[in-house]
Amino acid sequence: MVRVSTFAAILAMALSVTANVTPNDAGAKNVGTGNGQQFITGGCVNGTDCQSRCCAGNGENKGVCSNEVAANQNGKTGCGFEDPNKAQTVKEAKEQVKKQGF
């Protein structure tokens, strides 16, 4: 019984460490605007999109607004992310806004 519990705990920890943060699509209208209106967990192309001024890479070449304290958690690469595919990211965000209707 103890072995099963230990294995389950280690497995859960391993899965949580490797899980990457996905930008929240609800903030698609704020991606690439550079006006500092994006909320924490919303997508970003750089720090000027974020209220916190911290755009962290999510380890999959996507930006997510983060608090500086949490910028290196859950696979994030820290503040200072600059999206190398900015034009494509902004295009996808605009498509998401049309799809959502807001």
Swiss-Prot record:
Entry keywords, A to Z: Glycoprotein, Secreted, Signal
Subcellular location: Secreted
Major localization class: secreted
Signal peptide (from-to): 1-19
CC annotations in GO: extracellular region
Induction section of the entry: Expression is highly up-regulated in invasive hyphae.
Presence of the UniProt keyword Glycoprotein in the record: yes
Sugar attachment sites: N46
Keyword GTP-binding: no
Summary of the function given for this chain in its UniProt record: Secreted effector involved in biotrophic colonization of plant cells.
Descriptive protein name: Biotrophy-associated secreted protein 2
Protein's organism: Pyricularia oryzae (strain 70-15 / ATCC MYA-4617 / FGSC 8958) (Rice blast fungus)
Higher taxonomy: Eukaryota, Fungi, Dikarya, Ascomycota, Pezizomycotina
